[in-house]
Amino acid sequence: MIRQLQDMTGVDPTKVPIKDDKVMTIFNGIEGLDIKNPDYKFTHGSYGIPEFGTKFVRQMLDDTKPEAFADLVRISGFSHGTDVWLGNAQELIVSGTATMKDAISTRDDIMNYLRLKGVPNKDAFTIMEKVRKGKGLTEEQEELMRENDVPEWYIESCKKIKYMFPRAHAVAYVMMSNRIAYYKVYYPVEFYAVYFTAKVAYFDEKVTLKGIDAIEARMEEIIRKGKDASKKEEDELPVLEVAYEMCSRGYEFAPARLGISDSMRFLSYEGKVLLPFVAISGVGEGAARTFAEEYSRRPYETVEDVSERGKVNKTALDEMRAHGVLDGLPETAQMSLF
């Protein structure tokens, strides 16, 4: 994803600043998105951002209200651990027992905190290793922690943890997410084009091309089904959410166009997100590639030419025709003499 964004924008991701106030706003609200839709229903700006776009992590963002890069690193630790967040850090933070900065998020937090409290380095390391592997604490370790004024809530939190993420991994993940968020804020069309390219299998062009009302209606239809929604619909919903956000920012989809669209990738074209041929219902990956490759060798002259050289079957041909891809092409090369 990041390489495609670099190719489309010309912006080197390694030059993207870690600290950008506008980018940070999408992790605690929607201000940085410049939403144009007055009836916009979402309260998060992190849809489509790796690590931060899922419903689970969006709830974390609500509970923690991150304000800085370091907060995002902690959230990454919470989300990748087992029994680190649910029934543990979440309850401590929401109840006010601990702040996000105090709660345990990555394995390094434990050793650093215990050393700060005065626990000997070797013991702090041993405790960290036991906790991160889900082995809890011995009575002796608990007593040592109490002797150094480690609060009871911290000791109990350690005993609940089954697995912990290393801080270095969390930092690497968040750096990537932060860079992608930068493109989302400052290069929105390119961001959405790259996102939908990755999710094309779950993209329904018959809904998205109709615009924001149709997208919202389809989202609500799937949500109403609840647990009765199919796996395909569950996979479709996050893609619809990102499409809804995109349209709410004032951007549009453009139907696939012969001679301009790519076979597989969504493109930025005239300020819109241009669909690839593979996004058309009934057009598979192989057909889309062959269709585009044959056109690049020699432009199609007729619909019959598309069928023969492009190896496009009748179903795909009908969908292309309905989509407008074949507009301007005569059906055959035969000419009437009378």
PLM regions with names:
Residues 1-338:
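Noncatalytic, beta-rich nucleic-acid-contacting surfaces in large DNA/RNA-processing enzymes
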